[in-house]
Amino acid sequence: MADAATIAKLDEGFKKLEAATDCKSLLKKYLTKDVFEQLKAKKTKLGATLLDVIQSGVENLDSGVGVYAPDAEAYTLFSPLFDPIIEDYHKGFKQTDKHPNKDFGDVTQFVNVDPDGKFVISTRVRCGRSMEGYPFNPCLTEAQYKEMESKVSSTLSNLEGELKGTYFPLTGMTKEVQQKLIDDHFLFKEGDRFLQAANACRYWPAGRGIYHNDNKTFLVWCNEEDHLRIISMQMGGDLGQVYRRLVSAVNEIEKRVPFSHHDRLGFLTFCPTNLGTTVRASVHIKLPKLAANREKLEEVAGRYSLQVRGTRGEHTEAEGGIYDISNKRRMGLTEFQAVKEMQDGILELIKIEKEMQ
């Protein structure tokens, strides 16, 4: 049972949401009075309550989604709220659907989408993972953060070949190392207001760190938004190479670190938008002709379930006609299908851009 103080805060938060008529978040849409009453006294084994789930969305009424999972059990215990939000965000992933088993597929199917190097500036594929036996950010203790970091850094120090590299803890990081990582666009900052409000940044920078290989094409973030963000990237459009590197890294890490997995939802993450495959495959791409015809760009993107963002990711503008374009779908399909859909869409965009020239 949640304590009286928590329930009082929840009642207050619910009133605030109800009064916010211009709030468009999925939290507001699906936290009905019935659902609220059903969930407000519940508590996970690790002590998380509905307040942990909704407080970011209550504090930031301009949230798109507005909920986070404080631990793995929250997805089950608070499913009357999470399930409809997941179905809405991951279009058509119904509450009776089951996410397929992990399948990276035939990695030879992925190619260089821009062999002439005229359009794609860089390519990146990432996935998120949570370590089994640990809650997500809001419920972690400082000791757990440190324990996780030591497990992760020792696992990564065993990587060989192209993946071999160095782990840099954020704690005690020198200004020089910090600046170098910023210049390489590798350093993550303390969370934005949405993550801050979700209590995702406690004990900062304890247990946080960055690993990268010597070629700077493989990167792992430890305890940023998720326990692990595993990232493969390089300049140019060779999606095949980027994907193959990610797959071999994930398989290597998985041998040593058990990941949180849910029968129905796939791999578990802090934010419900990343569930399932957790895979985001993206390119930075120059499309000057399509940039001038945004409607056409969005139409093609929509056909292949692509998300079009500004150059520096969410909530930014396209600088010099350069877009960040990625797969939108992460649930109800395999890793292979998610990245293949993105590859097909990018090839189509390049084809149309060429025809318009």
UniProtKB/Swiss-Prot annotation:
Residues that bind ATP: 122-126, 185, 229, 280-284, 309-314
Entry binding sites for L-arginine: 64-68, 225, 271, 314
UniProt enzyme class: transferase
UniProt-listed Pfam families: ATP-gua_Ptrans, ATP-gua_PtransN
UniProt KW keywords: Acetylation, ATP-binding, Kinase, Nucleotide-binding, Transferase
InterPro entries: ATP-guanido_PTrfase, ATP-guanido_PTrfase_AS, ATP-guanido_PTrfase_cat, ATP-guanido_PTrfase_N, ATP-guanido_PTrfase_N_sf, Gln_synth/guanido_kin_cat_dom
GO cellular component: extracellular space
Signal peptide: none
Reactions accelerated catalytically: L-arginine + ATP = N(omega)-phospho-L-arginine + ADP + H(+)
E.C. number: 2.7.3.3
Example GO biological process: phosphocreatine biosynthetic process
GO molecular function, one term: ATP binding
Coiled-coil intervals: none
Entry keyword annotation includes ATP-binding: yes
Modified residues (N-acetylalanine): 2
Domain Phosphagen kinase C-terminal, chain residue ranges per copy: 119-356
Location of the Phosphagen kinase N-terminal domain: 9-91
Membrane-crossing residue ranges in chain numbering: none
The family this protein is said to belong to: Belongs to the ATP:guanido phosphotransferase family.
Protein name (database record): Arginine kinase
Species name: Eriocheir sinensis
